Amino acid sequence: MLIRGMKGLGDCIYQRAFIRQLRGPVFLETPWPELYQDMPHVRCVRPATELRTQAKNIQRHAKWVRPPSGLGTLNIRYGGAGIYNGMRSAFRVQPGVLDLPGFGSPPVTGRYVLVRPVTVRAEWRADARNPLPEYIAAAAAEMRRRGYQVVSVADLQPGHEWALEPLPAADVRYHAGELPVEQLLALLQGAAAVIGGIGWVVPASIAAGVPAWVVCGGQGGYNAPELITDRAMKTSQLTFAVPDNFCRCTERQHTCDKRIANYDQRFAEWADRLPAVV
């Protein structure tokens, strides 16, 4: 079977739950073969992509497999019905466990929180989805006040991807894509908590079982919590901060109302539930 899979990092994490249910061999087009290293029935096929971070990871690898001719093909997509519901239809199976391979020791020691700043990509702008950057910055500052290290991760490049101010204060910054995906996910797996907006940190946090504070922005027609999570996932460690007037649009650029009342208090209550730094 040839699977023309989703290409985003987050989508490729979600896919794991379905691909593990398929009988092998499975020939999978993916920019992120690292995510399937613990699945011996998966053969990774080089995909075509023009997106910067995907192409950069593809260039790291040489051992791509050429699928045999005549294979049946599944094209994986999802729409407004939700990520897992769309994948159920595309894969034609129910999901298994959503997890990650073990990626070893993180590049940072001690008690730390992983923070994903708010960024904009020129090649795929999703301004409406982004939360207000001051909410991420406030959360990072509060965690530093509580004694945690803050580690901020991004892959910024002038003219291609940039962060929105205010940037979260951080003890360690990897903002130039220094971490390959294995180290990035090892960093997440070793974190005391994760803070960020909608994106790859959501499925990665669920898969790793790490507490996550996820700040929603807009574009709720695709990115509402109930659409990016599912009853089949273990989401007890996931907390969403949702705008009071959550916009259910499906536009990537729209002036959604992203304000959240009593945000600082709500975040402090969430942080109080984390184990104290000693």
Describe each region flagged by the PLM:
Residues 1-278:
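Catalytic machinery of carbohydrate-active enzymes
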